[in-house]
Amino acid sequence: MPAPPRIHGKRGVHDSRFLRVEEVDLEFSNGERRTYERLTGSGLGAVIIVPMRDDDTVLLVREYGVGLDRYELGLPKGRLDRDETVEQGANRELKEEVGFGARHLKILTTLSLSPAYMTHMAHVVLAQELYPERLPGDEPEPLEVVPWKLSELHTL
């Protein structure tokens, strides 16, 4: 595998409340130079929670996604706060979005959702032994919680 491209420069193009668009000037191992844009964030990352109501039922949430301009059914997720472990952030987001906490949390993997243009990482966390507890969240409207059998995931 070749060495990563050499970075000749970085500059901020635009800042928003949550993200920054950054241009990165690169030189590849064959001498080819390109400028790419990427989204950078706080660097804290995010969590994607797999909340298991029982061994065969995952709890999904239906929420509006502005990127797709439609409501989507998916796993609860959110940004990590400062001074918060991955497990603490996952449990907080679970309480805010689903109305449950978890007695058992396990980090399954850490991944990039869009490695071509995003710098932050998402931690996928399995949440088991759920108990009812709701925290106020930052969602603009209540989220619909939808139990889904693992044996029926192919129908999503």
Q: Which sequence ranges carry the predicted segments?
A:
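Unchanged
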Residues: G45-I48, R53, G78-L156
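A glycine-rich, hydrophobic loop/mini-helix early in the fold
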Residues: L39, G43-K77
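Short small-residue beta-strand/loop micro-motif enriched in glycine and branched aliphatics
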Residues: N30-T35, R70-E72, E133-P136
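Acidic, metal-coordinating catalytic segment for phosphate/diphosphate chemistry
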Residues: K10-I48, R53-D54
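N-terminal positively charged helical leader segments and presequences
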Residues: M1-R11
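Acidic pyrophosphate-coordinating catalytic loop
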Residues: G12-R17, S29, G41, V66, ...
